């Protein structure tokens, strides 16, 4: 089935420049329409406890950025939706697939969030399909994102069940060790998986995991993503919820995966790890730099907006793009 399938990842690809048509990169438009709303960038911070909390979500929403609140403060989700709506901001939350989540979804009818993400490690499952159908029945106006998946069959099934977008990526992230613990996943070929899935997708795809540089955002869009979910690049900021730790005078912040023992509590099956990242500056500085770099990407693509990135040529260079630079 996969004999003539090209396998590559972000560091194996270089996009090929086209004639520039803008006077300055500032003319390039990085906005993306996703569901009924338009956002400043096609990126979304990972819905993980060390990346996003209520205050980060509010800052992102006020700034015109997409966000997805994590699902690990279950009791806080309904009040969160109410608070965001009272502030005139969009509400975007996550749910799992356990039985009690069905009642929770039904309880949102009076104040439905604009976006719900069904967030489990292996999203190609009957339990996810059932939950998509339940949300669509109870909250027909809510935009449903479902994942995570790694195959065209999964994308087709979730779309057919009613998902408005699918999240592609099984374990390619920096703090995800699914590939090591289970032998399964898209680690090492995430960009190929994205391309493979996008060929059958009729609805938007969120590329989730494996992003290490701002240039990887442009590459994700080239291979079919409408939105790019990023963990490690958004971790460790002053505003980030992770705990700050000082070692020999240097400050670090904790960052761990959604399926880690720190996330789940002890004695549960674990597919994530905890790492310390050097503490960064403000979140807005990273968002601004991402926007400027993406504007440069658009100018190299020979266009004025994100769509131009979908048409550029590319070469497969097998890890040589670093030219001896440290990873």
From Swiss-Prot:
<dbReference type="InterPro" id="IPR015875">
    <property type="entry name" value="IMP_DH/GMP_Rdtase_CS"/>
</dbReference>
<dbReference type="Pfam" id="PF00478">
    <property type="entry name" value="IMPDH"/>
</dbReference>
<dbReference type="InterPro" id="IPR005994">
    <property type="entry name" value="GuaC_type_2"/>
</dbReference>
<keyword id="KW-0560">Oxidoreductase</keyword>
<dbReference type="GO" id="GO:1902560">
    <property type="term" value="C:GMP reductase complex"/>
</dbReference>
<dbReference type="GO" id="GO:0003920">
    <property type="term" value="F:GMP reductase activity"/>
</dbReference>
<keyword id="KW-0521">NADP</keyword>
<comment type="function">
    <text>Catalyzes the irreversible NADPH-dependent deamination of GMP to IMP. It functions in the conversion of nucleobase, nucleoside and nucleotide derivatives of G to A nucleotides, and in maintaining the intracellular balance of A and G nucleotides.</text>
</comment>
<dbReference type="GO" id="GO:0006163">
    <property type="term" value="P:purine nucleotide metabolic process"/>
</dbReference>
<protein>
    <recommendedName>
        <fullName>GMP reductase</fullName>
        <ecNumber>1.7.1.7</ecNumber>
    </recommendedName>
</protein>
<dbReference type="InterPro" id="IPR001093">
    <property type="entry name" value="IMP_DH_GMPRt"/>
</dbReference>
<comment type="similarity">
    <text>Belongs to the IMPDH/GMPR family. GuaC type 2 subfamily.</text>
</comment>
<feature type="binding site">
    <location>
        <begin position="205"/>
        <end position="228"/>
    </location>
    <ligand>
        <name>NADP(+)</name>
    </ligand>
</feature>
<dbReference type="InterPro" id="IPR013785">
    <property type="entry name" value="Aldolase_TIM"/>
</dbReference>
<dbReference type="InterPro" id="IPR050139">
    <property type="entry name" value="GMP_reductase"/>
</dbReference>
<dbReference type="GO" id="GO:0005829">
    <property type="term" value="C:cytosol"/>
</dbReference>
<feature type="active site" description="Thioimidate intermediate">
    <location>
        <position position="176"/>
    </location>
</feature>
């Amino acid at each position: 089935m996969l004999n003539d399938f090209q396998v590559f990842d972000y560091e194996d690809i270089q996009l090929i420049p086209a004639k520039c048509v803008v006077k300055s990169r500032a003319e390039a438009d990085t906005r993306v329409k996703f569901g009924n709303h338009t956002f400043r960038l096609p990126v979304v911070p990972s819905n993980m406890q060390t990346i996003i909390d209520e205050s980060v979500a509010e800052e992102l929403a006020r700034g015109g950025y997409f966000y997805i609140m994590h699902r690990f403060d279950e009791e806080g989700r309904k009040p969160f939706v109410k608070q965001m709506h009272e502030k005139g901001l969009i509400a975007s939350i996550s749910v799992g697939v356990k039985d009690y989540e069905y009642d929770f979804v039904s309880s949102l009818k009076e104040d439905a969030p604009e976006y719900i993400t069904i967030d489990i490690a292996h999203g190609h499952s009957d339990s996810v399909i059932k939950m998509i159908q339940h949300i669509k029945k109870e909250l027909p106006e809510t935009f449903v994102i479902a994942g995570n998946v790694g195959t065209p069959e999964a994308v087709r099934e979730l779309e057919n069940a009613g998902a408005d977008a699918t999240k592609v990526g099984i374990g390619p992230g920096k703090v995800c060790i699914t590939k090591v613990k289970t032998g399964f996943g898209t680690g090492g070929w995430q960009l190929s998986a994205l391309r493979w899935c996008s060929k059958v997708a009729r609805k938007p795809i969120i590329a989730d995991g494996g992003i290490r540089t701002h240039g990887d955002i442009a590459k994700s869009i080239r291979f079919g993503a409408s939105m790019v979910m990023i963990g490690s690049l958004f971790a460790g900021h002053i505003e980030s919820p992770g705990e700050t730790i000082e070692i020999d005078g240097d400050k670090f912040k904790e960052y761990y995966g959604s399926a880690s023992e720190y996330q789940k509590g002890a004695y549960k099956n674990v597919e994530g790890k905890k790492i310390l990242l050097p503490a960064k500056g403000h979140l807005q500085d990273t968002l601004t730099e991402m926007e400027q770099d993406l504007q440069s990407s658009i100018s190299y693509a020979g266009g004025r907006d994100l769509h131009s990135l979908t048409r550029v040529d590319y070469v497969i260079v097998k890890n040589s793009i670093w030219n001896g630079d440290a990873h």
